[in-house]
Amino acid sequence: KVDTRYCARSAKPTTVAFVKLVDGQATYAFYDENTAGLLLTQDQLPHLPAAVSTLFFGGISLVNDPAATTYEALQIREAPARVTMIDPNIRLGFIAGKEGPYRARIERMIARADIVKLSDEDLHWLSGGGDVAQLARAILAQGPKLVFITEGAAGARAVTATQNRFVAAQKVTVADTVGAGDTFNAGALCALHEAGALTKARLSALTDAELDAALTLGTRSAAITVSR
């Protein structure tokens, strides 16, 4: 059951995503004009209790204002006391003509975040070519404590200042890839939560076993999603 008590209410329509599948691979088009998500403002942000340990940011919500500025303001407000995670989940068609401001916002939010998750494609868009682990360490130098890199059918990687862990993906027959990254994020966060690791202090002292558990639950969860 999803707890919705902190959700803002609006009579505006919901963002609509159109997905085109070719051999299980998805391309996206979004209708986001005058929607509830796009028009979220800072005065609608909830006050959060101490029981909320972690905030996740990502996706197309970080492209257009006022929502993009609102979510960045929420991160600025909450990052000193809570764990924050960001997955830019870049959709090139959605950011066309806005790449400069979008990149600047993503870079600011990455620098404030404790956890960053990127697909290998998003990593190269942000950081250029090169070795994935080295590029991840360059992101760590900006401020985060943990970087997850998903590498498609190969698997996923977790990089910290002293660790570089990799877990291979589960072999499945792919029906479509929609939601794979979101499911990985949920699985990885769930494993870190179950380990009691979603605090700033613990994220700086993760064991190899804890990283492997997060990668394993993330990749296995994503495997189920893409097989359906």
Where are these predicted regions, by residue range?
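Conserved N-terminal subdomain of the carbohydrate kinase-like
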Residues: K1-I60, N64
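Conserved beta-alpha-beta core of the PfkB/ribokinase-like small-molecule kinase fold
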Residues: T54, I60-A138, P144-K145, A154-G155
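Generic secondary-structure signature for well-ordered alpha-helical cores
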Residues: V2, T35, I76, P80, ...
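Short, hinge-like loop/turn segments at secondary-structure boundaries
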Residues: V22-Q25, P101-R105, A136, Q163-V167
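Conserved phosphate-binding/catalytic region of the ribokinase-like
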Residues: G128-R228
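Short gly/ser/thr-rich secondary-structure transition/capping motifs
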Residues: N34-Q42, A96-P101, G129, L203-S204
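Acidic, amphipathic alpha-helical patches
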Residues: L45, I106, V174
